[in-house]
């Protein structure tokens, strides 16, 4: 493998819908040379062509992990491959992707326990690329998180402040922009009126995410899971088609931002 052009380094961070609960066998194949995963935990001396499940084995005890109770992985298929494929298709910009996600995590937990691990993964990727004379054009974060804050009835103001505080740590590590993927619904189709009431908590977070991107130029609302209620496989997660469509939409917006 030889990379001769400058790359864009992207951290894919958040909770379970960033880690992905789809079906890898249904995900698209990435275009040859379009993107590579830097596995900061499990394979820090190499770049691996992007494929699903993205982030496999990128689990750190006492840090970002996505294990099942018996030690298997919860990562089963994400938005990343579709995103990178579209991003590369637009202008031919190669992506180096870094996994930094953990299911069921709130912004408060991220501030206390996980942002340091995520930033360390970004720093490791930067060092690897520098050591291998691979130039970096831009550093971005794709952030998909918020369901747990909705469950906890976090207010819009606190959610926006926590998210800004977290992304400031990425900014200090060199990130130039955050592309936010808005959360979807609590799947009230499975839970009737109680589910609709619970989904109002998620609407608070969706509104906070819209406001944050409107008010702060460091953030762009790049895609949303909100339209994909009928593609939900359980109370919180989606079939692969939804991850692919959200990833494609996000990749397109990201490249338009660069234009």
Indicate residue ranges for each PLM-predicted region.
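Cell-envelope and extracellular/periplasmic
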Residues: 1-259
């Amino acid at each position: 493998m030889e990379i001769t052009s400058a790359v864009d380094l992207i951290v894919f961070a958040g909770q379970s819908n960033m880690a992905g609960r789809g079906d890898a066998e249904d995900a698209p194949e990435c275009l040859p040379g379009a993107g590579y995963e830097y596995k900061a935990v499990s394979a820090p001396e190499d770049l691996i062509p992007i494929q699903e499940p993205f982030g496999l084995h990128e689990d750190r005890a006492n840090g970002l992990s996505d294990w099942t109770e018996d030690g298997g992985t919860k990562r089963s298929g994400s938005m990343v491959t579709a995103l990178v494929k579209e991003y590369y298709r637009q202008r031919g910009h190669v992506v180096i992707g870094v996994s930094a996600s953990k299911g069921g995590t709130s912004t408060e937990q991220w501030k206390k326990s996980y942002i340091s691990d995520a930033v360390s993964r970004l720093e490791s990727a930067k060092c690897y690329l520098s050591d291998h004379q691979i130039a970096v054009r831009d550093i971005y974060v794709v952030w998909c998180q918020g369901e747990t804050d909705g469950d906890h009835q976090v207010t819009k103001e606190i959610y926006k402040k926590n998210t800004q505080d977290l992304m400031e740590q990425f900014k200090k590590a060199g990130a130039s922009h955050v592309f936010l993927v808005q959360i979807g619904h609590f799947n009230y189709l499975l839970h009737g009126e109680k589910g609709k009431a619970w989904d109002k908590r998620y609407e608070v977070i969706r509104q906070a995410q819209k406001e944050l991107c409107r008010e702060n130029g460091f953030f762009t609302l790049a895609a949303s899971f909100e339209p994909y209620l009928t593609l939900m496989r359980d109370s919180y997660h989606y079939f692969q088609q939804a991850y692919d469509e959200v990833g494609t939409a996000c990749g397109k917006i990201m490249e338009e931002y660069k234009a």
